[in-house]
Amino acid sequence: MGLKNLDIMLGIESRVVFDILDVINGVTTLNKALVKDKRLDNLFLLPACKSIDVTKINFSYLEKIIVELRKEFDFIFIDSPAGIERGFYNAIRSASEAIVVVNNDITSIRDADKVIGILNSQSILDTKLVINKVNLKKIDESTSITIDDVIDLLNIPLLGVIYEDDDVIRCNNLGIPLAIESKSYINKCYCNISKRLNGEDVRLVKGKMSIFARLFG
């Protein structure tokens, strides 16, 4: 429902034949529209429709699709559009809990605070926080908001932290999910988030500065 590019990030764009609109219009079945990841047997993507504005979709159909998916899957993630507009409201209609992803800058935090308020008003009270693109050098220089300050300002449980790293861009361009890229220490961030989401008690991954930042920072 968001930027409609998850197929690229997963490296499966060439295998997409149908999308969610095809399912809604009865062109194909839900099972045929789902694209299975070649590396992970239990990871599937239901592609968004790239040719139509997401706000024009009748989301009562999305709710029916989610009901069907819940019969087969333990976790269903709905990628919400950016901003607080109709697409966002439609996306959360089918959600029972939410993960709010925020950068540690004041603008992003303010937007996230509004989102959390809306989620609460829609009775989505199980809301967790992921802080993205954390740059430890900027925090050390006091030019970026600390992780603790973000948690205090938003006042929801922290699910995990993703540190700013070139591996994120590299893996996105290669269509490799960082969660399965074992060569990257950012992999541990994603793995720990998934474990905490599943109820496991694991510590947050500590970030690291580059050697140049440590020597000359």
Language-model features, listed with the residues they occupy:
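P-loop/Walker-type NTP enzyme "switch/lid" segment
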Residues: 1-71, 172-173
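Residue-level signature of catalytic and energy-coupling elements of molecular machines
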Residues: 6, 23, 46, 79, ...
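A generic structural signal for short coil/turn motifs at secondary-structure boundaries
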Residues: 53-56, 137-140, 180
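Conserved phosphate/pyrophosphate-binding and hydrolysis machinery centered on Walker-type P-loop NTPases
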Residues: 55, 59, 88, 183
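Short, conserved glycine- and acidic-residue-centered signature motifs
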Residues: 58, 62, 108, 186
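Conserved catalytic-core segment of NTP-binding enzymes
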Residues: 64, 68-71, 75, 81-164, ...
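C-terminal boundary of histidine-terminating zinc-finger modules
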Residues: 172-188
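A short, charged, Gly/Pro-tolerant segment at domain boundaries
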Residues: 192-196, 205-217
